[in-house]
Amino acid sequence: MKKLISALMVVVAFTTSTYAQTDAKAKAILAEVSKKYKSYNVVKTDFTFTLDNPKAKVKETQQGTLYVKANSNKYKVAMTNQELFSDGKSQWTYLKKDKEVQVSNVDNSGDAINPAKIFTVYEKGFKYVYTGEEKAGAKTYQMIDLTPVDAKKAIFKVRLSIDKAAKQIANVVLFDKNGNKYTYNVKTFSPNVNVPETTFAFDAKKYPGVEVVDLR
């Protein structure tokens, strides 16, 4: 399960705020997606995250829920065995099986690994190209492939599936040089949900018996 949370972090390891100038159509699509997403306050998504490596015969899947403040580093990720919290200053990683929560400072630098940026994964460090449309049921998805500007990166390709009508990322697939494929599939997307600010911080009073390891 620790592999899964590490893999989830990999999904958002290449983020921030400037586009690589490679494909005008892809750029226009992503600009619309970014503009719409950043118009929201708090977004809630239910997702499936899968780590797949056929050669190593590894396939792990985890269901989860993400609450994220679209224009900040505040988020909560809830999965079966782990939870992540961030109030923008501190980050908590709660390991349920170990009854332990690790506290660290948030890295607010542009290249920081941050689940809050899952829907803006494409915004820095990538070249990208529009590869066409695919249909699934009644929906049409715009497909965009990204490759890192830095060829030394472990991830060599990212594939985005964007719901054409909703202008939202529906699926992110990452491919790394070790043969791993990471898939983040959005099952539900609920914008502007009302949650208290306390959602984004770990409250030890609600978790009796949990050891707090402060790494700050």
Per-segment meaning from a language model:
Residues 59-64, 180:
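Amphipathic hydrophobic-ligand
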Residues 131-133, 137-208, 213-216:
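Gly/Pro-enriched, hydrophobic low-complexity segments
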Residues 106-139:
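Flexible, surface-exposed loop/linker segments and immediately adjacent secondary-structure boundaries
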Residues 49-51, 79, 95-96, 173-176:
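Beta-turn initiation residues at beta-strand->coil junctions
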Residues 65-113, 182:
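An acidic-aromatic
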Residues 5, 16-59, 71-73, 206, ...:
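N-terminal leader/targeting segments and the immediate start of mature chains
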Residues 1-7:
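Positively charged n-region of N-terminal signal peptides that target proteins for export
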